[in-house]
Structures are given as C-alpha cells and as structure tokens.
Swiss-Prot record:
Localization terms from the record: Secreted
InterPro entries named among the record's database cross-references: Pectin_lyas_fold, Pectin_lyase_fold/virulence, Pectinesterase_Asp_AS, Pectinesterase_cat
Chain segments annotated as coiled-coil in the UniProt record: none
Originating organism: Olea europaea
Family to which this protein belongs: Belongs to the pectinesterase family.
Molecular function as annotated in GO: pectinesterase activity
Keyword Amino-acid biosynthesis recorded: no
Name of the molecule in the record: Pectinesterase 2
Length: 364
C-alpha cells in the first residue's frame, strides 16, 4: 500500500472518531424529573469534552491532588486555612480538600490566585459544616462571610456553610452576616446548603452554577453582580415580622452581562418578595419554579420609581399559588417561548467551556 493510501485510511479513521461536544444551548427542561438525565447528557466528564473546554482546566483536572481534613484536626492539616496556605499561588492542578463529617469552626478565605480548589464532603448524608459568626460591624458586609472564594474554577460538593451570627433585629448596626461570598469566575456548587439571615449569599461576580442546593435567609439573601444559574435549588425565606426579600441583583446598566436565573427551583418559608431593584438594571429570571403562597402577590419591589423602565424581572411558567401573575407589579414581564428558549440554558454561563459534574473522590 502506498503512503498516500495509508494516509487516506488514517484520515478516514480520524474522521469517524466520535468527539463529544457539549451543547449548552439546549433549553433546560421544564419537567424536573428530566433534569438529571438532561444534565448528565450535556455536562459529561472532562475526558470526553476536551475539545470544547478551557485548555488550562483540562490540564488541571488530569493532575488532581487530595488533602484529607478532619474536624478534630487529625487530617493532613490541622485546619482548613493551613491546607489552603499549602496550595501555591497560580496553582495549575486540581486540589481537593476532602472533609470528613463534623463542625469546622473557621473563617476561610481562598485568595484570587489559588485556582482549581474543590471542597468535597465525603458523606452527603452527614455533611461537614463550615461555621463562623462574622458580622458587617466587624468585617464589613462582603468580608463577613464564613467562606470567601476569590479564585477561579472553585467547586463545592456536599457541604454546609453557616454564618452563626444572630438574626438582625433592626437595632444593631452592622448586623448583616454573609455565609458565602463567591467572587471568582467559573464556580460550581452541588448539594451545598447555605444558612444565614440578611445577605446570606454574596454572589459577587463571575459565572457560577448551583444545583441541588439550599439557601435560606431574610433580607437580600442572594445579592451581588454574578451571572449565575440556580437549578433545582430551594430558596427558604426565614419567617419573621417583616417579609423576606430573596434577591438584590446589582446590575447597574443594560450593557452589563450579569443576572440570576432560577430554574426548576422551589420557594418556601414565610412571606417573601422575589427581589428588589437594588441597582437600576437588576436582572433576575424565575422559570419553572414552585412558589408557595408565601410570595407577595406583587412579587417584586422597586427601590426607586425610575427603575421601572430599566429593571428586568421576567417570569416564565412558574407553578403554585405564589406564581399567579394577575396581581404582579406592572413592570414584571412574562417571557415568551422564544425568549425563554434563548435565555434559559447553560449557554448563558458558557457551561460547555468549564462546568464539570460533581467530583466523586474515592478514599481508602
């Protein structure tokens, strides 16, 4: 056989090698029973998606290191912060902090140069708890968080994050207390439960993904300038004397590519508004979400009258008594089917480039 013929045969073989391309533009299904199979079909392991993923991420995932932590300090390091300190700046490989069950009473910060870190709870039925009681009075609002992540490609699996500071009573100055601040890009959270009152989750900036999570709070308990999808996640408004406000998204202008997307979620608890116009062009979308009768009929709050023409608070095919649109504020828009198909997808956070399924760590 000639060299030309051999080359032709090899080319033919290569053309028929299957390459898995993650189509993150496919709309998220309305039926919650289909979510997992749909997600697993799109967000496959890195080994079959190398062609579409960030090259540096592909390299990092091939060199994973596991650090074991125990709440009594008998793991590879005595504390979470010691373990993080051991990771070099400009880290280029995945480092998995694997937590045994128990309480970890620390205020933890991952700096902006410590990329590719995973917090992994070994037992999803007995999840490790990160807990601290920082407040705005002591640290400032965004720095009060129990866990602060400023680096890229962070992931958390099977974890509880708690700010144990007391509920604000309207009298104490600086009583806000965040549990989590995520300021890095391309972060994912699977089966993570986040507890606080006012300002529980600072979804600060970057593209983020939450699946099968639980977030509770009172006032503005999800706030910031992130561009994030919340999928199959429970939003629990802690009952109190005043209605809760779930979101305070911080988009200032129409040109900013940020916003929160709640898809196939559940809103539970006491009386609540879905959000308020903290900033002039705040953008929050609720779709296929179960809303109990705790939701105020108007749904949303305008902080300033002039925000009426600039905020974007669309809703699409939500369910339950709280989803009734008859008494919604007049600035609330119903998405059309075409608009929903275009915007309610993993493509809005470019998931095909970076989002991976939750890591499963095999331990001896």
């Amino acid at each position: 056989m000639s060299c030309i013929a051999v080359e032709a045969v090899l080319l033919g073989i290569l053309l028929y090698i299957p390459i898995v391309l993650s189509d993150d533009r496919a709309p998220i299904p309305a039926n919650s029973a289909q979510l997992n199979s749909w997600f697993d079909g799109i967000i496959q392991p890195v080994a079959v998606r190398k062609a579409t993923m960030d090259p540096a991420l592909v390299t990092a995932e091939g060199q994973a290191k596991v650090i074991k932590l125990k709440s009594d300090g008998s793991g590879d390091f005595k504390s979470i912060n010691e373990a993080i300190k051991s990771i070099p700046d400009d880290n280029t490989k995945r480092v998995i902090l694997s937590f045994s069950p128990g309480n970890y009473s620390e205020k933890v910060k991952i700096g902006m140069y410590k990329h590719y870190i995973t917090f992994y709870g070994e037992d999803p039925n007995n999840m490790p708890i990160l807990v601290f009681g920082g407040t705005a009075a002591e640290y400032g609002t965004v720095d009060s968080a129990t866990l602060i992540v400023e680096s890229n490609y962070f992931s958390a699996v099977n974890l509880k994050i708690v700010n144990s500071a007391p509920r604000p009573d309207g009298k104490r100055v600086g009583a806000q207390a965040a549990a989590l601040r995520i300021s890095g890009d391309k972060a994912s959270f699977y089966n993570v439960k986040i507890y606080g009152f006012q300002d529980t989750l600072c979804d600060d900036k970057g593209k983020h993904f939450y699946k099968d999570c639980y977030i509770e709070g009172t006032v503005d308990f999800i706030f910031g300038s992130g561009k994030s999808i919340f999928l199959n996640t429970e939003l629990h408004a802690v009952p109190g004397d005043q209605p809760a406000i779930i979101t305070a998204q911080a988009r200032k202008t129409e040109s900013e590519d940020t916003g929160y997307y709640f898809v196939n979620c559940r809103v539970t608890g006491g009386g609540a508004f879905l959000g308020r116009s903290w900033m002039p062009a705040a953008k929050v979308v609720f779709a296929y979400t179960e809303m109990g009768d705790a939701i105020h009929p108007e749904g949303w709050i305008l902080v300033k009258p002039e925000h009426e023409s600039t905020v974007r608070f669309p809703e699409y095919n939500n369910k339950g008594p709280g989803a009734n649109m008859e008494k919604r504020a007049k600035f609330v828009k119903r998405l059309s089917d075409a608009e929903a198909k275009q915007s309610i997808s993993l493509g809005s956070i470019e998931a095909s480039k970076w989002l991976l399924p939750p890591r499963v760590v095999g331990l001896p």
